[in-house]
A protein has these predicted regions:
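Short acidic, Gly/Ser-rich segments with clustered Asp/Glu that frequently serve as metal-coordination loops
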Residues: 1-4
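Mg2+-dependent endonuclease catalytic cores in nucleic-acid-processing enzymes, primarily RNase H-like
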Residues: 8-133, 152-153, 164-175
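Acidic, Mg2+-coordinating catalytic module of metal-dependent nucleases/exonucleases
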Residues: 132-154
Length: 175
């Protein structure tokens, strides 16, 4: 079983998504990542994870989402996609609104740069699915973030509650 965890840290700034940090590791439980999130000192507006957070562990009967709740992380599960092309297209539409801290996100950017389709040696063509290797974890984590529809979530009450009140009132940008 592969237990690699990849986390992108995003900040909404106007009509942009700033990818400000990236964390990846393996061989650690959710409690480790909860501790790492707390150490970062960020104020989180939400946590978004893939559909497999609902998988229940045989030993405890708890899902990964249940375990995360015990450490103060409430995930919104992003539904499974019907095909890989849908996820790739979501990232293609998402990236133009992103600004990436190249230093803090270097490992994640490397994953995106190296995410590839899998080659079928027998048939001499690419398969219709991506290659599952070290780069796929960061790329799939970005896909999950891209499909989280962050801008729509800004207007939701529970997401807005986590943001400090503005002292400037209502400002708008005109283009």
């Amino acid at each position: 079983m592969n237990d690699t965890m990849a986390i992108w840290f995003a900040q909404i700034v106007g009509r942009e998504v700033h990818l400000v940090d990236y964390l990846e590791g393996e061989g650690e439980g959710i409690e480790f990542y909860a501790d790492e999130l707390n150490k970062k000192g960020y104020r989180y507006g939400g946590h978004f994870g893939p559909h497999d957070l609902a998988v229940r562990e045989l030993g405890t009967g708890l899902s990964r989402s249940d375990v995360a709740k015990q450490f103060g992380i409430k995930f919104e599960t992003i539904p499974r996609i019907s095909n890989h092309a849908e996820g790739i297209q979501a990232v293609r539409q998402f990236l133009p609104v992103c600004w990436i801290d190249e230093e803090a996100c270097a490992q994640g950017v490397n994953c995106i740069d190296n995410f590839r389709k899998e080659w079928d040696d027998k048939r001499g063509v690419y398969k219709d699915r991506p290659r599952h290797d070290w780069a796929s974890h960061g790329a799939k984590a970005l896909e999950t973030l891209a499909r989280a529809d962050l801008f729509a979530r800004l207007s939701r009450q529970d997401f807005a509650k986590s943001r400090p009140p503005s002292r400037r009132g209502n400002w708008a940008a005109h283009t």
